[in-house]
């Protein structure tokens, strides 16, 4: 085990939970352009676009976990995706070489596969459809090139998570759970489409598992908590967790899309963004599943089932009193 670990970009949602679970097991420092709400004492302010800052920050470390990324849908200019996600990765690797660091864990994304693929595993061809996915794939290629220069000495682990949810997160899964829990949810379509999801408490434990088992070599993993749920099953999970009956209203898909187009037009007229759009209706009704056989046969055992992760999130967000109002925004 390599005990000295630098987390890059760990002031956000996943990084905060990773610090929480790993701080007792490793000598950890966080390098981020934002201060950490919960771990300021081990956080150094820095940016992956700043080579000098990286060169200095990596001194004395054995392993890097690279979490930093531009990931929002509305990043402008779009060149930021490539400046941070691709060139930032190059900068990190350059700093690693200067400091003799040979181990890196990189969080990529299932976005590298593109839309509407049938349960892709790690060997599925890449076909990213947006700048985020394209930049993540390019970053992976940079990492593989680095690894291939000294494969017997270097360790590269690439983790491609599906959508991650959990306590304090403000993203698409939270918005969906909030609508269901509040009784303001209307199912578009039959509700039989499946969605792959990942609970933050599990993915950070997998990263910690890989940190405890660093070895020379290259591995890539999809991360999904199985089994996948369809939308009807997700509503049932919310009902069970909150012990309340959720109104069951199904809107036919054509009507849902019509409503989405109406909001598209309204958005163009007013210049405002709305929670409903034709793209979101289409995504909501699509089956989005990814194969995670490899990660779940790697020796890692997730501490929570998907149902437990949902229950923990729902109880924290909609039942129990909160100690603070700190949240993390994602897509």
From Swiss-Prot:
Positions contributing to substrate binding: 109, 132, 183-184, 199-201
Catalytic activity field: N-acetyl-alpha-D-glucosaminyl-di-trans,octa-cis-undecaprenyl diphosphate = N-acetyl-alpha-D-galactosaminyl-di-trans,octa-cis-undecaprenyl diphosphate
Entries under InterPro entries matching the protein: Epimerase_deHydtase, Lipid_A_modif_metabolic_enz, NAD(P)-bd_dom_sf
Residues that hold NAD(+) according to the record: 13-14, 34-39, 47-48, 109, 132, 136
UniProt key word Zinc-finger: no
Subcellular location: Cell membrane
Protein name, per record: N-acetyl-alpha-D-glucosaminyl-diphospho-ditrans,octacis-undecaprenol 4-epimerase
Native organism: Escherichia coli O157:H7
Underlying gene: gnu
